[in-house]
Structures are given as C-alpha cells and as structure tokens.
C-alpha cells in the first residue's frame, strides 16, 4: 500500500514540475476519452474498430513513456 502512495505522490510531483510528463498525461486522458467514445457507440463499424485499436496502441505507448519517466524519477530519488 505504501508503494502505491509513493507512486501517487511521485505522479503528482511530476504533474506539477515536469511539462513533458504533464503533456503525456493530457495525451493519455484525451486518448482514453476517444476510446471510450467509440466503445459507447451502439453500432461500431469495422473502421471504428480499427480506429479504436490504433488509439489503444497510442494510449499504451504514452502510458509506457509516463512509466519510464516515473522509473527514472524513482532512481533519481533513491540515488
């Protein structure tokens, strides 16, 4: 549980102090919103499904970049 709190604090710190991390977080939120919009449609076309997969991959890539920055910050804090 303590690790989760430390991660939350680290994310909050990066959101306040790191413009690149903040940009990634905003991109991730926007991509999540776009995916949810497609998923909420009553009828999803093949083009919608392709777009949804593209957005999900992009969202995952941004999340990976954020996690990489968090990991770098963890090491900087320890070292």
Where are the model-predicted features located?
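Extended, charge-rich alpha-helical interface modules
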Residues: 1-79
